[in-house]
């Protein structure tokens, strides 16, 4: 398969996330890397007219960010194959939480506990323990577990399945986030 064809195949096979991620990165760059909640209201709220405008305005940059993901995926796949052929398994982390300023939160705010302005109602952390006498404030938005339950936890299933394309063993970082929630 030619590189251009392989890139198109990658985009099709990863259409569920790569397009949104690439658009997010291009728009973020357009707004000088400020958090998406500081972008113009129309694109911050993903109004269709604004989405069309930025898809056209940032078309080349969107393709560039998708290509970067393709290049990483291709190189990582070759590395993983080499490691596996030599008896080495790759262990990878999947963080339980995503950053507030992320493609996930911008593309699907309904998955998180946000208010009407798409600001977090509460953020993640952990209480005092043996590692920290004062506890920790991580600042990540909390999930809307009712939404995830209604959707059969599909986002989680897809996320974890994708990790198993990248790693042989997946570690949830940190599991306490699930256990204590």
Model-predicted segments: where are they?
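Conserved, well-ordered alpha-helix/loop/beta-strand core segments that scaffold catalytic motifs
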Residues: 65, 70-98
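Alpha-amylase-like alpha-glycosidases and glucanotransferases acting on alpha-linked glucans and related
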Residues: 1-73, 98-181
């Amino acid at each position: 398969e030619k590189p251009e064809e392989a890139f198109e195949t990658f985009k099709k096979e990863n259409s569920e996330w790569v397009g949104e991620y690439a658009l997010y990165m291009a728009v973020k760059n357009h707004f000088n890397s400020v958090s998406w909640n500081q972008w113009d209201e129309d694109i911050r709220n993903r109004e269709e007219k604004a989405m069309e405008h930025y898809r056209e305005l940032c078309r080349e940059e969107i393709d560039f960010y998708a290509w970067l993901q393709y290049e990483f995926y291709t190189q990582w796949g070759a590395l993983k194959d080499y490691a596996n052929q030599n008896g080495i398994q790759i262990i990878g982390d999947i963080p339980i939480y995503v950053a507030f300023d992320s493609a996930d939160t911008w593309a699907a705010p309904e998955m998180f506990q946000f208010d009407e302005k798409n600001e977090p109602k509460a953020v993640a952390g952990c209480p005092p323990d043996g590692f920290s006498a004062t506890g920790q404030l991580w600042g990540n938005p909390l999930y809307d577990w009712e939404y995830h339950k209604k959707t059969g936890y599909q986002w989680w299933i897809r996320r974890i399945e994708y990790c198993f394309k990248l790693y042989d063993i997946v570690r949830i970082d940190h599991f306490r986030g699930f256990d204590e929630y």
